[in-house]
Amino acid sequence: SRMDKYKSCHFSYFMRYGLQAEPRKPAGFTAPEYGTFVHYVLEHVLRDEMFRQTVLPGFADPVAGAEGRRRLRELTRAAVDRYVEEELGGLEHQTERFRYLFRRLLRSVQAVVDNVAEELAASQFRPISFELGFGSGQDLPPVELTVDGVTISVTGFVDRVDGWVHDGRLYLRVVDYKTGKKSFDLTEVWNGLGLQMLLYLFALEARGPDYYGQPVDGAGVLYLPARDAVVKGSRAMTDEAWRKQLDRELTRSGLVLDDPAVLSAMEHDALTEPHYLPLRVNRSGDISGSIASAAQLGRLGNYVDKLLRQISHEL
């Protein structure tokens, strides 16, 4: 995040991290607070054993999945209640407007949770790490490089890491929850922006075997929109129509490994009718979109390392 700030505007970087200047905090539930809220709910729901054992099995089935959806709502409500008590100290002392706005958010949060559950129910990839830290005293050491005789440490957190084991190798994808309109763009990467997820993926390829105890391959990176998506429609819009439009707002972006086995493991219908992955399939069955071969990912890793050294030298 700091690298993005530096590359986009040196002065903004100096104001924020040199002078520690911050904008005045408005009253209410701000976008960053909403992002923290969604992170909290998703992590607590996906970590829960009930989610793995009773929600996901048969979740995609319209009939058998009904019980799973009911349990998912219970898990979401429990996570929301915990957040309210732990982070907000309850709602009793909040203004009536704050409570009203917070209640409005609950529908969107449940829709995001439902969307993630539906994706995982149609996938063999499973969450294996949450808030995975790179840095001193964290899960993994920082990414370090020496430039001009000075060692630079890059630290941070991965929102979620999903894994799938195939032929004795662990395929990893990095998932980043985004509360804004951010999407993955290779043009930005070329200009030194949006390196965060790729940096984490390549670091996991290097350090993952020791951490996870088996050979590791990078399977890709995905931005998951976790914002309070605004759905435009009439008051007569049905819940089903509202959900379909919201699902479009929650479309993922990113870059995934161009390997049929990996793509099918990420999403069962990836090679025919992808719904969650940033792919397109034409009538001939040819796949296009945000895909890269293992060799292309390797070259991209070398380019990211070059950019890191350039940024470190400039700093």
Predicted feature residues:
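Structural signature of nuclease core domains in nucleic-acid processing machines
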Residues: 1-315
